[in-house]
Every structure is written in C-alpha cells, then in structure tokens.
Amino acid sequence: MTSIIGRPTIQHDIQNYTPLIERHYAAGTRLLTINNEITSSISDILSGCLKKQSCIELIERAVNVQMKYRWSGGRSVALMSVLWYGCVKDLVEQGIDQRVVVIVMQCVVEKCVERMKEFKMSSQGVDLLSLCKGLAHGCKDWKLVYKAVSSLTSFTSLKQVSVLYEQSVVPSLVHAGVLVPSTGKVRERERIVILCGDLCSDYNHTGYKGILKEAQIFTPNLAPSTSQLWLNKITTHLTSLSITSILVSGKLDPDLAHYCSQNNINIISTKYDTLARLSDQCDVAMLPFLDACTARDVIEVKCERVDEIWVSISPQGSDHVTILLRSCNKIKGSDISVTSLVARVQAALQDQHVLPGRGVTELKLSQTLSHEVDLDPLLPQWQVEDVTLYSALICQRFCQSLLRAEHLARTNNEGLEEFNFDDLDSLSLEDVESEVYDVLSIKESSWLRAFEVTRVLLGIGLAVKPPPPPKEK
C-alpha cells in the first residue's frame, strides 16, 4: 500500500474504496449512452478512474479540469470540497476507520489549498474551515477533525465565519464561533483583545481604588464620577492600541458599550470557555484588566469581506429569528425573517431562467428548508442529513459534467460548451438562441448560495442559544 502524501498508511488504503467511486459515478455511463459516439470514450475514462486512480486523484483531476476549462476562482475548489463531503459521509457510514477518513479529508483539503495558491486565489471564496466543521457531523470526533484543520493556518483565522447577531447592547459578529459586536462598518484589519473579568468601573483592582478616594474631594456637581474617570482611562488606552474588538467574559459597562458603538469598536460578553479556547488557538493571554494590555496581547486579523453571507438574529422578546443576508456583489441589504428567506431561496431555485429543466434536486433542497422552518421557527437544532443528501446529488451530477468536459478537451473540441445534468434522465447542452439555456456557472452559484445559507443556519444552533420560553405559573 502506498502512503497518502507522505503519511504512514493506516490499515486501509483509499484505493480499496473503488465501490464508493463506482456508486458515485456509475450513473454517468448510463447518461452518456445518449450519445453513442462518445460512450466508449467516457466508459474508458470511468473505468480508468476506478482501476488506476484513488478518490483523491479523481477529485484532484476534477479540480484541474474545472480550473482549466471553467473558472480560475475559488468556487471550483468549493464545489470539489462539498463533493468530497458526500464521499466522506459515505465512508463513515461504511464503518471505515475514522482516522483514515480524517487523513483522506486532510489530504483533499490540502490539495485544494495548493491549487488555490497556485492560481493565486483568495480564501474568502472557499470556507475550508466550515467544510471541515461540516465533516465533523460525519466523523463525530472533533479532535480528529481539528488535526485536519490545524495545518491550514492561513485559512483558519477569525474571518472565516461571519454571522450578524443582534444583542441588547450592540450588534455583533460571529467569528469562528466567537460572538463579537460590530457597528456593521467594514474594516481592513481587526485588532482584538481578550479579557477574563468584568469590563466596568466598579471592578475592584489596584489602580482604581485610589480614583474613588480622589473623586470624593471635589465639589459636588463638579467632581467627575468614578465611572467617568475610569471611562476616560480605558478609552485612551483603546485608542493608543487601535483596538477594534473586545471579548470579555464578565459584565459590560453601559457607558463604555455606548462609546464603543459610537466609535466603531466591537465589544461583547461571552463564555469564559470560549475565550479560553480562542486565546489558546491564537497564542495570546487572557487579561484580567484592560489597562494591562500591551501590543503583544492583541490579536490582529486581516479582513477580506467580499461577497459574504451575514445572518442577523433577534431572539430577545421575540418568537422568531430574523435573517440579514448581505453581499457586496449580488445580494443587497435586506432584513427578512427565516420564513421569508426560505421563500426567496425557493423562488430563486424555481426560476426557469436560472434553473432550466426540472431542477428536482434544488426543489427538494428548498422544500427541506421550508419543512424545517415550519417545524421550529427558532431553529435550535437542525438535522443536516437531508441537506447533505441533496447537496451530494448536485455534486454527483456536476462531476459527471466534469468527466464529459475532459472528454471534449481530449477530442480537441475548441468550442467547449457549457452543460450540466439537470436530472438523471436528460442531458442539457447550451443553446445560445434559447432564453432558458442551462449556464452551469449560474446554476452552481444559485444552489451553492442556498447551501451556504443552510450551513449558516445550522451553525446558529451551535453558536446562539435562544432564550428559554417563560415558565407557566
């Protein structure tokens, strides 16, 4: 057995999983019988994949074909990554050793990263961290998944996940599962500090005791209060260090929160365990007091917020969740409820100009979304199985298209056509004169955005716990 990218081989070799590949791509041979002229060539490609190549090599080749003949952007890698998600899920269901699954997953993600670097692509188009988190649903072992993620140092920063969360003090962003407030303005760099105590004027420690005694000497109505002196000291320190975000495990001072909201400084109180994990990952100290902060205690993150999905939740005093979906390119700012969001996704998926043909898979995806929302508007727990199934079906058809693309490239067809399989019984080719021809890039963008919205909604149940209903007296 050969090792995977230099790692020691563990009991199973990926090349032994040819039945898995065959199950994912067997439909391609039946579909391609529509054109007898190319059936034998495509069958040779499929059989060559099954006999000579591993899953990893097949995925890598698909990525290469996609980038060469389709796009040079991160969406190609994202598609291949999500496709691998379905393969990993099948591996786990077959009872394969989880260690092997994680090694294979890490190998594919690393290959995707290599391709991204080779084509000088930015990371915001591919949420590799979210991909690995999604794979954890299949592996059911976060420690193993973390090993796969840990090597991707350039793709595991705080900028990977952005979820807008409404709180009583100020809005906040979810960065990799950590709640951080924001005024909504975009900054090129985030400078974050972590505190393990309260952030208020009555937090008793050396340095603030003397201020209280001095304040009592001044004439009433003219003497600055203890909180004012403390606020002046803290704001001066924040300005000197150019702090943009504060994570604190204790209480928040309302005056400081107001000051931060007016000056575009993020501030939020969250769990101590969450801050400890973030502090450990970023290799910075958790400070007891803000005035003890130095430049080396600040986490600096470069933000590349382009075409992101943002989600706004308003749980306090309400019985529903509000979604805010924003994008620099395609989606303008809009504040809508979960039900309305699902309706919009479903409408987009049913648009014949975007999704010609039946669009069976996409329709099932939107119906699943609607069904889940009807069951529980607050979305405390989402089941990922159905969404994963439909996403895997789409990816399966997409990879079948890639195999045909490779055949066209081999036959020196310079006029490579846009195409995609809309269902398992028909083959759609581009018809420039038609108003509803199937443009693969548009279709891929539509379902990928719908799937990303679903993934964000799944993450909400983990990051945000809605307030419990009032107890009946």
Stretches with model-predicted labels:
Residues 1-66, 250-251, 255, 262-267:
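Generic N-terminal targeting/processing segments that precede catalytic cores or assembly contacts
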Residues 1-10, 17, 65-198, 202, ...:
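Non-catalytic interaction/clamp surfaces of large macromolecular machines
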Residues 25-33, 73, 99, 118-127, ...:
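Flexible, glycine/charged-enriched surface loops at secondary-structure junctions
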Residues 90-138, 294, 298-310, 322, ...:
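A structural-propensity feature for long, helix-poor, extended segments
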Residues 191-270:
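Extracellular/luminal Protease-associated
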Residues 82, 96, 106, 198-200, ...:
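Short, ordered loop/turn segments at secondary-structure junctions
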Residues 328-473:
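Extended, low-charge hydrophobic alpha-helical regions
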Residues 268-335:
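Conserved phosphate-handling catalytic cores of large alpha/beta enzymes
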